[in-house]
Amino acid sequence: MDVNLYCSALGMLSSMNNLFFPVILAGGKGERFWPLSRLDRPKQFLSLDGSSQSLLQATADRLLPLANGWQNLWVITSSAIAQGVREQLPDLPESNLLIESVGRDTAAAVAWASLEINKRYGENAMIGFFPADHWIADPEVFLATISAATELARSIPAIVTLGIKPNFPSTGYGYIEQGENLCSFNNLPAYHVHRFTEKPDRETAATFLSTGRFSWNSGMFVFQTSVVLAELRTHAPEIIQPLEQYGPDIYPQLPKKSIDYALMEKTSLAYVLPAAFGWDDLGDWNAIERLLKQEDNPNVELATHIGLDTQGAIIYASNPDDVIVTIGLDDVVIVRDRNVTLVVKKDRTQEIKQILKILQNDGRFTDLL
């Protein structure tokens, strides 16, 4: 086969339909950013990079050029924070806000939103799913990458995910191994996905990096409604069939599964585009150091801090009048927000979720969640 001729034909096919519907996944709790992230103010409502915009607002602004306006932008979120979404995104049409009665992870969210957009715009509609709480640099590169993913998904039956080039052996991200190279879109190579691997140990992650074939799983996807609905019917009928039969009223009875587990690890239509834009999923407090570390300061200080023999600390206070004083501390996170002070070693921030379970089970502290 003449690959160049094949890719040229794909490009001609992809230009036939330009409607694109970005969907923002905004139902998460951001528990590992507690106590700053709480039930009444989850991570997506926060600004963590020093800007005036929340993560949700920044995500919407990034996607508006792709959506060609608010009328094509969608958000799916939980009933607990739906009003907060309305306040943060006042221009979002109410009909484009999908409100989950209970959280059922990303597979149910993707299935429901895809069904709704399919009803309104038909099976040829192109959809992209984007987490609300990620940090992305290089907006022009981001837009070009999504355009390439859309071009690929319009051209052939494909569920396209964006892979982030890893720059260190992270144990906190999932990995995607590239398989056969298809061709290039917008000068970006497209690969068939060989396999997904959930959060590996450090040695395995280092091996992945050395091969040059692996990228981080960004959690961003692009596809045509007809393709994803057909694949969900094949690989996740326990999610899509009840939604098709009963609608969102069945939500509490749906299984709680991620889209990676329910579909991406099973489908033969998964493709990956390695992305070149700066990215961080802001998974826990250590992400603040990756974003804001300055060479002339041994600590990351988002508070008034007086320190003696303190290095590698991340220090945050929501009240500018609070002063945090440290002596002889290395590699810690200190967060002061409202009526809570958190002190934790940087390598144990993943355990914050365990603390939240303790608080939830102890009736005295539910107001701290």
What are these regions (language model features)?
Residues 56, 113, 133, 176, ...:
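Residue-level signal for inorganic ion chemistry
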Residues 3-14, 223-369:
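Left-handed beta-helix
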Residues 24-26, 76, 128-131, 161-165, ...:
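Short beta-strand segments
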Residues 139-241, 248-251, 271, 345-346:
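Conserved core of the sugar-phosphate nucleotidyltransferase
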Residues 2-24, 32-39, 49-131, 135-141, ...:
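Conserved N-terminal catalytic core of the sugar/cofactor nucleotidyltransferase
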Residues 74, 127, 194, 213, ...:
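A residue-level structural signature of the nucleotidyltransferase/glycosyltransferase Rossmann-like core
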